Each structure stands twice: as structure tokens, then as C-alpha cells.
Amino acid sequence: MATVIAKVKVMPTSPEVEKESLKESLKELVEQNDAKCRGVTDEPLAFGLYTVYVMVEMEEKEGGMDPIEEAMNALENVESAEVVELSLV
């Protein structure tokens, strides 16, 4: 099987969401889903809002990134999470 690298774009619910706490929650969630977190970055968006990008490495399997994406969307302070890049290594 191949290794999959995915970039997930995560939007917090508001600018008041504590950035470092959200990043730590995302890292833990990735590792709980049998994947490796290869980095978490944030970029300013507008009016204090920011976007978080999570790089995920995992073995290719049926369902792919769907379980991780769904789990991220279920987090309390996450407005949306979507895979924006996906590649095989």
C-alpha cells in the first residue's frame, strides 16, 4: 500500500477560539485515527479570523481521509474542515 499525504484546511468557529488549543486538539485527533501529524500551521484570514492547515500522513486504505475529516468537523470549535490537497508518496 502507498502512503497518503493530505493537507486539511480547518476554519475555527470564531476569532476568539484559542489557536494553540485548537492546533493541539487537531494533532491529537489525527494520532487517534492511526495517522501521523506532519505539521500544523495557521494563516491570518480577516478580522482576527485565521485558517489552520494540518498535514496528515497515513497508509492508503478504504475510506481514505473521510474518518479524520468527519472527526475534525465534529470538534467543538471547528466551523469546517476539508481536504484541500491529497497525494500519494
From Swiss-Prot:
- InterPro entries per the UniProt record, alphabetical: eEF-1beta-like_sf (IPR036219), EF1B_bsu/dsu_GNE (IPR014038), Transl_elong_EF1B/ribsomal_bS6 (IPR014717), Transl_elong_EF1B_B_arc (IPR004542)
User: What are the record keywords, sorted?
Assistant: Elongation factor, Protein biosynthesis
Domain of life, per UniProt, equals Archaea
Has keyword Protein biosynthesis?
yes
> Could you cite one Gene Ontology molecular function of this protein?
translation elongation factor activity
Among Pfam families, the record links this protein to: EF1_GNE (PF00736)
What this chain does, per the entry, is described as:
Promotes the exchange of GDP for GTP in EF-1-alpha/GDP, thus allowing the regeneration of EF-1-alpha/GTP that could then be used to form the ternary complex EF-1-alpha/GTP/AAtRNA.
Tell me the protein family, please. Belongs to the EF-1-beta/EF-1-delta family.
Q: Know the name of this protein?
A: Elongation factor 1-beta
Q: Which organism is it from?
A: Methanococcus maripaludis (strain DSM 14266 / JCM 13030 / NBRC 101832 / S2 / LL)
